[in-house]
Amino acid sequence: MWKHVSQVLADQFGAYYSIKHKEKIHTGEMHEAWIIDDGIQPVFLKVNDKTFRSMFRAEADQLLLLAKTNTINVPNVYTVGCSHTHSFLLLEALPLDKTNPVDAMGKFGEQLAKLHLIKGADNYGLDFDTWLGPEYQPNGWKENWATFFSEQRIGWQLQICREKNLVFGDIEVLVKKVAELLAKHKPQPALLHGNLWIENCATVKQEIFTYDPACYWGDRECDLAFSELFEPFPRQFYESYDRTYPIDEGYPERKAIYQLYYLLNFSHRFNKHYVELTKKFIHDILSR
């Protein structure tokens, strides 16, 4: 694999590129991650077996899609490659600082609002499917937001949970309830990061960069809801966002519904206390 990576990098940066140093920095839920360099140009490498090529291709396409908006900062994409045994994604290696200063987060709120203000779709979905963490995320286009979110987000995650022997009651009942609660809400489709929480943000030279997206065109409130779920962003982020693109007064009523999608995902991935929290959210939603 390393020989193939070296050849791809030589094609990308010029024949002079030769890997002189490599350091494994993370073996996460799915992929290995490395920093490799030739002494001049460091590169971030995600690697897995060759069956993951489509996942890496989707991640690259999402980062390119976000980069084209000239709003939020994302790593540059170099290429997606595949050897006989492995697939990999090569990205810009950034000196990430996880402190995320308040001033930088305030500016990030404005940048995210500008992303959400872009009009590029009439319906909800994306031209290709993506992943939320290790789980497939279907993005088939729908004209109706309530149908899209209830079926392709809540219903989909509930089905994955059930396949992993994690049952949260009758799937059809909850999907119907979510559709009912969202029935009158017809948001302008916004391009979403889709996986926006503090773990996917870091600072580079006083600018917030974000990564690991799960993009689609949907309700902008989904990004805001996940950002508030576990470790909310600083107050300045939301104030800056609201100044640039005022938050709808009905958002508090929908926030828990959108957060449920991520809680279901975390429940079947990590279990632990997420299951009990998810049960509480479901109970509260069904009680409305």
From Swiss-Prot:
Q: Which SUPFAM superfamilies match?
A: Protein kinase-like (PK-like) (SSF56112)
Keywords attached to this Swiss-Prot or TrEMBL record, sorted alphabetically, are:
ATP-binding, Kinase, Nucleotide-binding, Transferase
Cited InterPro entries: Fructo-/Ketosamine-3-kinase (IPR016477), Kinase-like_dom_sf (IPR011009)
GO MF terms here are: ATP binding; kinase activity
- Per the UniProt entry, the Enzyme Commission number(s) are 2.7.1.-
* Binding-site residues, ATP: 92-94
- Pfam families, sorted: Fructosamin_kin
Provide the family line: Belongs to the fructosamine kinase family.
Q: What does this protein do?
A: Ketoamine kinase that phosphorylates ketoamines on the third carbon of the sugar moiety to generate ketoamine 3-phosphate.
- This protein is called what? Probable ketoamine kinase PM0587
Q: Which species is the source of this protein?
A: Pasteurella multocida (strain Pm70)
